[in-house]
Amino acid sequence: MARPDDEVGPAVAPGHPLGKGYLPVPKGAPDGEARLVPQNGPEALNGGPVLDPLVAGAQDGPQALIAAEEETQARLLPAGDGEDVPCPACPPRTALSPRRFVVLLIFSLYSLVNAFQWIQYSSISNVFEDFYEVSPLHINWLSMVYMVAYVPLIFPATWLLDTRGLRLTALLGSGLNCLGAWVKCGSVQRHLFWVTMLGQILCSVAQVFILGLPSPVASVWFGPKEVSTACATAVLGNQLGTAVGFLLPPVLVPALGTQNNTGLLAHTQNNTDLLAHNINTMFYGTAFISTFLFFLTVIAFKEKPPLPPSQAQAILRDSPPEEYSYKSSIWNLCRNIPFVLLLVSYGIMTGAFYSISTLLNQIILTYYVGEEVNAGRIGLTLVVAGMVGSILCGLWLDYTKTYKQTTLIVYVLSFIGMLIFTFTLNLGYIVALFFTGGILGFFMTGYLPLGFEFAVEITYPESEGMSSGLLNTAAQILGIFFTLAQGKITTDYNSPEAGNIFLCAWMFVGIILTALIKSDLRRHNINTGLTNIDVKAVPVDSRVDPKPKAMVSIQSESSL
C-alpha cells in the first residue's frame, strides 16, 4: 500500500539522487553519519526508513533538495529484492521440520527394543535359573549390568554427544543394541550363561547412548509448545519396551513346570530342547527387529533440522563452538544447587522403579506360586499406566510450564502408590495387584520425563545431554544399591513388604529434596522472549557477571 503524502515529505523528481536510493551527506560530515535509525512508528510498518536528524535536516525545503545534488552521495542497500540487511534486533528465523516425527519414532522404537532386552530375563527369572542352572543373583545381574555399565561410560558418551552430535550417538546406540541381540542368539545352551551375559553387556553399553537422548532429541527437533510432549513420547518408547518385556517372555518362554499336570518338572532332554527352542525364538526375533531398526537409523535419522525449532536452539546454534567447555559444563552443573537436589531426588525415584521392575517376578511369586504369566501382566499394567502418565504429564507441562509443582505432586502420589501396593501384596487376591500396580506405575513411571524436562529448564544453556546423563547416572547407581538391598531384605526376612518399605523410606527423602528445589525456568524465558542470556558456560559463583544481557522479567515458579 502506498504511504500518504504527509508521511513521505516533498516529492522527489525522477532521476534525482534521492530517487535512486542515495542520501545527501552535508559537506564536512564525518563518514558514516548518514544512517538509518530504527523506527517503531508508521514509517517502520510501511517499510520507510527514518533518517538521522542530521540527514533529515538536509531535506528541509526545496532549497535543500536542489543543493543536495552538489553534496557527497551515500549509497543505500535496496529495500526490495536486494540483499537482506542484517538486523541484530530481529529474532533468528525458526521453523518446524516434518522429519521430526520420523526421528522421534525411530528413536522410540530402538529404545523400546533396548528396554525389552533389559527386562526380558527378570520377567521370567525362574525359567532362566532352571535353564542355565544359576542362582537368582546371577539373573538379577543380567538386569543390574545395565546400571553398572552406565556409570563409568556416561561421561565419554555425553562428550561424544556434545562434540560429535546426535546422529553418531544414535547410530552407536542402535548398532550396539543390534550387535548384543545377535550375540545372545549364540547363547542358547545350558553351559553358555557367560555368552548371554556378554550379549547383555553390549546391550547395556548401547543403553548409555540411548537413555540420555530424549531431551536432546526433543530440544533439537521440536518447538517450545511441543518439546515436553516430545520428550515424554521419547521416554515412553523405553517404557513401552519394559512393558513388552513383562508381557512377551512369559508367553514365548513358558515355565515347563506349568505344563505338567502332576506339577512335577521333569528335566528330560525333550523339555530342555523345548525350552531352548522357545528361548531361541525370542532371541532371534529380537535380533531381526534390532537389525531393521539399525538400518532405519542409518537411513533416516538426521543430525538436526535445517532451521532451529525454537529461539533457545537458535541462540545455541549461534554460539561459537570454542566457547563451549565440557569441563566447565560439568562443573557448573555440580555447583548448581537446584540441579543437585533434583539429581538426588530423580535418582531415588528412578532407582526405586528399576528395583521394583527387576524384582517384581520374585515379589509376586512369593505369595502367588505358579503365576508367572500374571506377574508379567502386572508388570505390563504398571508400565502401561506409566506411559499414560508420561504423556499426560508432558502435555500438562507444555500447557502450564509448572515444572516444580507438577514434579512434587507426582512424587508425593508415587510415594502413596508405593504404600498402597506394598500393603495389598498379601491380600490373597492377585486381581487387586493389577489395580494397585497400575496406580504405582502411573505416577512412578510418569515422573521420568518430568525430571528430564525440569533439569533442562533449570540448567539452560548447559547441554541437555549432560544434564540427562547425570540424572541417569544417579538413577543407575541408586538402582544397583536398591536392587541389591531390597533383594537381600526380601530374601532374609522372606517378606517383600520389608523390601518395599525400605524403598518408601527413601522416596520420602526424595519428596523433601524436591520441595527444596528453587525453580528458575531459564529455557522457557528465552523461548518467550523474556530474557536473552549469554550462552557461555560461566561458573555459578564466578566474578564474571553472568546476568542476562537484556531482561524484561524473569519467570520463576512460586515456592510451595
Curated annotation (Swiss-Prot):
Glycosylation sites: 270
Pfam families: MFS_1
Transmembrane segments: 93-117, 136-163, 166-185, 193-221, 227-252, 271-300, 337-367, 372-400, 403-425, 429-458, 467-492, 496-518
InterPro entries cross-referenced by the UniProt entry: FLVCR1-2_SLC49-like, MFS, MFS_dom, MFS_trans_sf
Keyword Acyltransferase on entry: no
Top-level taxonomic group: Eukaryota
Keywords: Cell membrane, Erythrocyte maturation, Glycoprotein, Membrane, Phosphoprotein, Receptor, Transmembrane, Transmembrane helix, Transport
A GO CC term assigned to this protein in UniProt: plasma membrane
GO molecular function: choline transmembrane transporter activity; ethanolamine transmembrane transporter activity; heme binding; heme transmembrane transporter activity
Enzymatic reactions: choline(out) = choline(in); ethanolamine(in) = ethanolamine(out); heme b(in) = heme b(out)
Free-text function comment from the UniProt entry: Uniporter that mediates the transport of extracellular choline and ethanolamine into cells, thereby playing a key role in phospholipid biosynthesis. Choline and ethanolamine are the precursors of phosphatidylcholine and phosphatidylethanolamine, respectively, the two most abundant phospholipids. Transport is not coupled with proton transport and is exclusively driven by the choline (or ethanolamine) gradient across the plasma membrane. Also acts as a heme b transporter that mediates heme efflux from the cytoplasm to the extracellular compartment.
Family note: Belongs to the major facilitator superfamily. Feline leukemia virus subgroup C receptor (TC 2.A.1.28.1) family.
Name of the molecule in the record: Choline/ethanolamine transporter FLVCR1
Taxonomic source organism: Mus terricolor
Gene (name only): Flvcr1
